[in-house]
Amino acid sequence: MDIGCYPITTSRFIFGEEPTRVVGLIENDPDFKTDRLASAILDFPSGPATFTCSTQMVHYQRMQIFGTKGRIEIEIPFNAPLDKETRIFIDDGRDVHGSGIVTETIPLTNQYTIQGDVFSRAVLGLGDVPVSIEDGIANMAVIEAVFRSANSGAWERP
């Protein structure tokens, strides 16, 4: 799973817990034999998370987090372009017209350079690793369960 790892990681981070089961659909590219379109439902003890991602559809990237009193939308959250600021829209949910939306802007940055710098500092003993090996293993268990579900057509446990 290519970009599906990002919404899975983010969902686990937001909920602060692991999903108990997942169901997924995956379409593979017939030439490259890689996943090109994936959708999944992750069933967490606190509620569901859903995502759809693709490597071969129109360029569009958003993450939306819905709560009972509002929502947050992040524009281009996972590979922000080097020439465009990232915007976060915070909606207090006062109406369906979005009159309660406040926009926060994150300045231009190179996420991959920062990631490389943080990793290098950790390797040199100058900082902590921001994500543990255990977290990576837990994320991989969810990804593998989505693949199993796509093959079985049933809910699977990570």
Predicted regions and their residues:
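Oxidoreductase and adenylate-handling cofactor-binding alpha/beta cores
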Residues: M1-E27, I41-G47
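Short glycine/serine/threonine-biased micro-segments
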Residues: D2, V22, I65-T68, V123-L124, ...
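A structural signal for well-ordered alpha-helical segments within the folded catalytic domains
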Residues: C5-T9, T113-D117, I137-A141
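Phosphate/oxyanion-binding loops and surfaces in catalytic or ligand/nucleic-acid-binding neighborhoods
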Residues: I14-E17, T68-I72, V146-S149
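NAD(P)-dinucleotide binding in Rossmann-like oxidoreductases
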Residues: N28-D35, F44-Q115, S132
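Glycine/small-residue-rich pyrophosphate-binding loop that anchors the diphosphate of NDP-sugar donors
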Residues: A38-A40, G127
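C-terminal helix-rich "cap/oligomerization" subdomain common to oxidoreductases
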Residues: E104, V118-P158
